[in-house]
Structures are given as structure tokens and as C-alpha cells.
């Protein structure tokens, strides 16, 4: 009976990034050393979401990075939660290519906190669709999994209303 209870209510779990044993109270089920490596973005470019480094002598608020400054985009704003580094790469690649679909829940939790922090209001959640070929090969759409979890957490409707027509090359692997 104890083994059954340990399975349902485990005392310790593993870090979703490095598999190190942790307490289930750890933030996002990530160990302290991996969590320290996650660089949460405070000030980001309004267009690409990359961090903007502010200097103490700057008096005016900079909204765009040097790359995006004076470029036209087909959207108003982009927000990034965390810098892409070795630790966050393991989360993304684990979800996309190693069938670790449970990671979508943790990504959605991080996104929820950023949305609340930035006081962002919205009516619907959409996700970027995969081409049918890629969806058949992978078996799931990671963006849809994240969007589904985010929709549940923030109680905002998820819409599946756009489709991908063009097959594009993979960015990784």
C-alpha cells in the first residue's frame, strides 16, 4: 500500500531539466542550480522580446533593441519570458523532440506569471500550427500543448483557427 501511495503522492521528484532529485515544492519542478541558470527577462525589446540592457545614464525608456529599431513588423508586440540558453534549450528540445509533453505545463506556468507581471489582457489564445507533414512525424504540436495548458491556467479560450500551408525547414535537429 505504501508503494502505491508513494507513486501517487511522491515525496521527491526529479528536476525536469537535469533529473536531479528535488522536493515537489520546487518552483516549476526545477532544481535550484538549474533555476539559477534561467535568466528571466525583465526589460525586453517590444518587437523581438530579447533583453534590453539599460544603463544608469539612460533617461528615456528604450522599447526596441538596435536590431529591431526602425524595422516594420506585422505585429504590435512580442514578449519573452526567459533568455534562451543551455538550460532553457533542454526544456524546449525535451518538449519538441523527446516526447516530454509534460514540460508544456511548466512553460505555460512561466508564461502565465509573465502575463500577470506585465498586466497583459487578452481575449483568446492562439497557437502556431505545424504543417501536416511535421505534425504526422512528431505526433503532436508543442505550441498547441503549451497553449492548451496556458488556456486552462488563465481561463481564456483557446482557438484553433489558423492553418499552415507552407512546409518550412526545421530550425533544429
Question: PLM features: residue spans?
Answer:
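Glycine-rich phosphate/pyrophosphate-handling loop used in enzymes and phosphotransfer proteins
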Residues: 1-173
Amino acid at each position: 500500500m505504501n508503494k502505491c501511495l508513494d507513486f501517487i503522492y511522491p515525496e521527491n521528484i526529479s528536476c525536469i531539466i537535469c533529473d536531479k532529485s528535488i522536493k515537489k515544492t520546487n518552483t516549476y519542478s526545477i532544481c535550484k542550480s538549474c533555476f539559477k541558470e534561467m535568466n528571466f527577462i525583465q526589460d525586453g525589446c517590444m518587437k523581438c522580446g530579447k533583453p534590453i540592457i539599460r544603463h544608469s545614464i539612460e533617461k528615456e525608456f528604450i522599447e526596441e533593441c538596435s536590431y529591431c529599431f526602425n524595422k516594420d513588423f506585422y505585429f504590435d508586440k512580442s514578449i519573452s519570458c526567459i533568455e534562451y540558453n543551455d538550460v532553457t534549450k533542454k526544456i524546449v528540445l525535451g518538449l519538441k523532440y523527446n516526447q516530454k509533453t509534460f514540460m508544456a505545463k511548466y512553460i505555460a506556468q512561466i508564461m502565465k506569471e509573465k502575463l500577470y507581471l506585465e498586466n497583459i489582457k487578452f481575449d483568446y489564445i492562439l497557437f502556431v500550427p505545424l504543417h501536416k507533414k511535421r505534425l504526422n512525424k512528431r505526433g503532436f504540436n508543442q505550441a498547441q500543448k503549451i497553449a492548451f495548458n496556458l488556456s486552462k491556467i488563465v481561463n481564456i479560450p483557446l482557438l484553433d483557427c489558423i492553418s499552415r500551408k507552407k512546409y518550412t525547414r526545421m530550425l533544429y535537429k
